Swiss-Prot record:
Function: Involved in the isomerization of 5-deoxy-glucuronate (5DG) to 5-dehydro-2-deoxy-D-gluconate (DKG or 2-deoxy-5-keto-D-gluconate).
Enzyme class, UniProt record, top EC level: isomerase
Taxonomic superkingdom: Bacteria
Keywords per UniProt: Isomerase
Provenance organism: Bacillus subtilis subsp. natto
Reactions the enzyme catalyzes: 5-deoxy-D-glucuronate = 5-dehydro-2-deoxy-D-gluconate
Pfam name, any one: KduI
Entry-linked NCBIfam families: myo_inos_iolB
Pathway participation: Polyol metabolism; myo-inositol degradation into acetyl-CoA; acetyl-CoA from myo-inositol: step 4/7
GO annotation, biological process: inositol catabolic process
Protein name (Swiss-Prot/TrEMBL): 5-deoxy-glucuronate isomerase
Amino acid sequence: MSYLLRKPQSHEVSNGVKLVHEVTTSNSDLTYVEFKVLDLASGSSYTEELKKQEICIVAVTGKITVTDHESTFENIGTRESVFERKPTDSVYISNDRAFEITAVSDARVALCYSPSEKQLPTKLIKAEDNGIEHRGQFSNKRTVHNILPDSDPSANSLLVVEVYTDSGNWSSYPPHKHDQDNLPEESFLEETYYHELDPGQGFVFQRVYTDDRSIDETMTVENENVVIVPAGYHPVGVPDGYTSYYLNVMAGPTRKWKFYNDPAHEWILER
């Protein structure tokens, strides 16, 4: 199995709370992005104290209440399945704060972390405030829900987005990268992909590769897998009959998403 691919686990961290994924700077090649997925049984709670990190808590499915002990957001979350294809609620919390998540129903929650030193206000990112985009043409069409885009100044370094790609289409395509701190041409952003498939027995293909091929990994990615992108191009292909969902987390030294297309494939945009 590729070192960039993570399969789901089911490790109980407290009563009613299971850890599905944990990507950290200690167990990966990432420096800026950390990522967790938790399953919470109805009525259970998860607490954590942030140090020099900010977090975006995404209510992937189910309903939750989130508090940082100053602000409380009750009964947030909009869907039982990501394939309802509607935006969900999220909460941004800045560094040096503690938070608690309580499950109002059975819930899956994504915790998206990046470094932060400047404290910003806690914020509820309502589902209706997610910007929705339809990108691409031909067989490269996808729908994007922008949770924390770079146009929103609510965070110091985090960028968070959900993407839906229909059967037979490609996403993050033509292949693009953002691994050079060379603005305005390109920004350096690490990235994680949390994947789900409909139907659940499906898979997608994802390739992560650099120009010099020092990274060149092609992966069969199944439901609830995570792909780590420390650098390089990272396209996703969705086979016929299946729909792809993924949650992206990005962060780097500058909070700007400026990508560079692989010159070998940029002609695709000129059709």
